[in-house]
From Swiss-Prot:
<feature type="region of interest" description="Regulatory domain">
    <location>
        <begin position="440"/>
        <end position="558"/>
    </location>
</feature>
<dbReference type="InterPro" id="IPR000891">
    <property type="entry name" value="PYR_CT"/>
</dbReference>
<keyword id="KW-0479">Metal-binding</keyword>
<feature type="binding site">
    <location>
        <position position="40"/>
    </location>
    <ligand>
        <name>Mg(2+)</name>
    </ligand>
</feature>
<dbReference type="GO" id="GO:0005737">
    <property type="term" value="C:cytoplasm"/>
</dbReference>
<dbReference type="GO" id="GO:0003985">
    <property type="term" value="F:acetyl-CoA C-acetyltransferase activity"/>
</dbReference>
<keyword id="KW-0460">Magnesium</keyword>
<dbReference type="Pfam" id="PF08502">
    <property type="entry name" value="LeuA_dimer"/>
</dbReference>
<protein>
    <recommendedName>
        <fullName>2-isopropylmalate synthase</fullName>
        <ecNumber>2.3.3.13</ecNumber>
    </recommendedName>
</protein>
<comment type="function">
    <text>Catalyzes the condensation of the acetyl group of acetyl-CoA with 3-methyl-2-oxobutanoate (2-ketoisovalerate) to form 3-carboxy-3-hydroxy-4-methylpentanoate (2-isopropylmalate).</text>
</comment>
<comment type="similarity">
    <text>Belongs to the alpha-IPM synthase/homocitrate synthase family. LeuA type 2 subfamily.</text>
</comment>
<dbReference type="GO" id="GO:0003852">
    <property type="term" value="F:2-isopropylmalate synthase activity"/>
</dbReference>
<dbReference type="Pfam" id="PF00682">
    <property type="entry name" value="HMGL-like"/>
</dbReference>
<keyword id="KW-0432">Leucine biosynthesis</keyword>
<dbReference type="GO" id="GO:0009098">
    <property type="term" value="P:L-leucine biosynthetic process"/>
</dbReference>
<comment type="subunit">
    <text>Homodimer.</text>
</comment>
<comment type="pathway">
    <text>Amino-acid biosynthesis; L-leucine biosynthesis; L-leucine from 3-methyl-2-oxobutanoate: step 1/4.</text>
</comment>
């Protein structure tokens, strides 16, 4: 039995911001992105990346277009130090990419950080210390003044180290009041202002103030309120870039980041697919693709999402969930019958109108935009309906079933999937269609036919069809204005099966002079029973005659 949560947990206090403006704001451009897979992401892995995996991840991030990449904590890890030296000494950092390194406010760590950066063309030195009320009390046993002193002394040491560094390295600075969301807002402004006093940023050379939701503690709107409150209260706002670093403890990191952008932030730190401590960092792929679907260029190349996922899984040794937004195996897949029908109609409408704007029910994005095909969009199981079955047969085999046949055949498929409890593949669907319609050879199996004018009737023809029935080959004869009517007459004379043709459709299976034709016949009996028949042949007439016999065979069996 669950405990009473009111006895153990307290609600997060709201931010006093009655005149908040972010709810009416709109995201119109991508932020500055900083990928932290090689630090925040790596430290959360069961098996942290070795040198080869780190290089592969770094190369992927560069290929995608990330221009700021946090590469590690070189002063705290020999592995990170060696990796950074490898990137620099082997000239592996593109000219337009700035690396970022993390350091705490300790002289020995800061000195080691600058050693690691020797020879880099450009870098961001990221200084941080925790400022939350909880950590001040429990971890550091320091008051506000003591924590501010740590930050200021750290900033001074970073600036001194920068003064001694090679002039060939273009340095920028970043400060994070770690656990920002658990810090009193007035104190967050106070400590950041103190650090600004050391770095003396300008509008041309701004300081990055990174405001982490180190542990997600409230609903996304609260983070947005905190960011807007901070941006308003901070002096010289034009001299800083406000950076976000959301975590996903409550499952709303993406929403928190988006609302905080609306509240005035300029930059976001995150990881591919949200890898990171506990429930992860904010997912840069989802954030970027969310913007893409709103017509905003994220500035990142997600055109081959499966390749991105493959490398991320290889480097992190963690799978991406099948339902992960945009990248999961099943995110564009519909099993539901009503969804499949709507998607099928939407794709047909797009093809017919040839419009530029994407509008397909249940598909917020064209899968082709991220390197996916339509093949996995519709799959068939016991929850599926006629729309999904029809879509797959048309997409993979060129069969455009009439609506009535869609209903009829979907019942056959439903019976199979209900029995097996499993998905039926495209190949399995085609096999079932063949067995149900194209292989329905009892009692009649078509072999050949010929027609001739009927001397006894104007506009009438006599058809002789050679069929195999009961294991024997024989001819059946009938009269009619055309081959179909004549074959119906022949069946009535031969077996007494009095069918009426209710509907007839035909089309070619593919363009070209050698294309095969497919014919669909709906036939009924006087007692109201009806069934479809299907025939395929290089000749339209033969295809239609095969379809008549197929329907007759089904009605004979009933």
């Amino acid at each position: 039995m669950m405990i009473d949560p009111s006895k153990k947990y307290r609600p997060f206090p709201p931010v006093a911001l009655a005149d908040r403006t972010w709810p009416s704001a709109t995201i119109t451009k991508a932020p500055i992105w900083c990928a932290v897979d090689l630090r925040d992401g790596n430290q959360a892995l069961v098996e942290p990346m070795g040198a080869d995996r780190k290089v592969r991840m770094f190369q992927l991030l560069c290929e995608l277009g990330y221009k700021e990449i946090e590469v590690g904590f070189p002063s705290a890890s020999q592995t990170d130090f060696d990796f950074l030296r490898q990137l620099i000494e082997r000239d592996m950092i593109p000219a337009d990419v700035t690396i970022q390194v993390l350091t705490q406010a300790r002289e020995d760590l800061i000195s080691r950080t600058f050693q690691a950066l020797e020879g880099a063309s450009s870098a961001i030195v990221h200084l941080y210390n925790s400022t939350s009320t909880l950590q001040r009390r429990v971890v550091f046993a320091l008051d506000r003044a003591g924590i501010t002193d740590l930050a200021v002394r750290g900033a001074e040491m970073v600036r001194e180290g920068a003064a001694k560094a090679s002039a060939s390295t273009k340095l920028r600075f970043q400060y994070s009041p770690e656990s920002f969301t658990g810090t009193e807002l007035d104190y967050a402004v106070e400590i950041c202002e103190a650090v600004m006093g050391v770095f003396e940023p300008t509008a041309e050379a701004p300081l990055i103030l990174n405001l982490p939701s180190t542990v997600e503690m409230a609903t996304p709107n609260v983070y947005a309120d905190q960011i807007e409150w901070f941006c308003r209260a901070l002096p010289h706002r034009d001299r800083v870039l406000i950076s976000l670093h959301p975590h996903n403890d409550r499952g709303t990191a993406v929403a928190a980041a988006e609302l905080a952008l609306m509240a005035g932030a300029d930059r976001i730190e995150g990881t591919l697919f949200g890898n990171g401590e506990r429930t992860g960092n904010v997912d840069l792929v989802t954030l970027g693709m969310n913007m893409f679907t709103q017509g905003i260029d994220p500035g990142i190349d997600f055109s081959n999402i499966d390749h991105i996922r493959e490398i991320a899984e290889e480097c992190n040794r963690l799978p991406v969930h099948p339902r992960h937004p945009y990248a999961g195996d099943l995110v564009f897949t519909a099993f539901s019958g009503s969804h499949q029908d709507a998607i099928n109609k939407g794709l047909h409408a797009m093809e017919k109108t040839n419009q530029d704007v994407w509008e397909v029910p249940y598909l917020p994005i064209d899968p082709k935009d991220i390197g996916r095909s339509y093949e996995a969009v519709i799959r068939v199981n016991s929850q599926s309906g006629k729309g999904g079955v029809a879509h797959i047969l048309e997409r993979d085999y060129g069969i455009r079933m009439p609506r009535g046949l869609q209903v009829e055949f979907s019942k056959v498929v439903q019976a199979i999937t209900d029995t097996t409890g499993e998905e039926i593949t495209s190949r399995g669907l085609w096999k079932t269609f063949e067995e149900t319609y194209l292989g329905a050879g009892s009692p009649y199996s078509f072999l050949e036919h010929h027609t001739r004018p009927d001397p006894a009737g104007k506009d009438q023809r006599i058809l002789t069809a050679t069929v195999k029935a009961g294991g024997k080959v024989r001819d059946i004869d009938g009269r009619g204005t055309g081959p179909i009517e004549a074959l119906v007459d022949a069946l009535r004379k031969d077996s007494g099966l009095a069918i009426t043709i209710e509907d007839y459709e035909e089309h070619t299976l593919r363009p070209g002079s050698d294309a095969q034709a497919v014919a669909f016949i709906k036939a009924s009996l006087p007692d109201g029973r009806a069934h479809y028949g299907v025939g395929i042949d290089a000749n339209f007439v033969v295809a239609s005659l095969k379809a008549v016999l197929c329907a007759a065979n089904h009605l004979s069996d009933k």
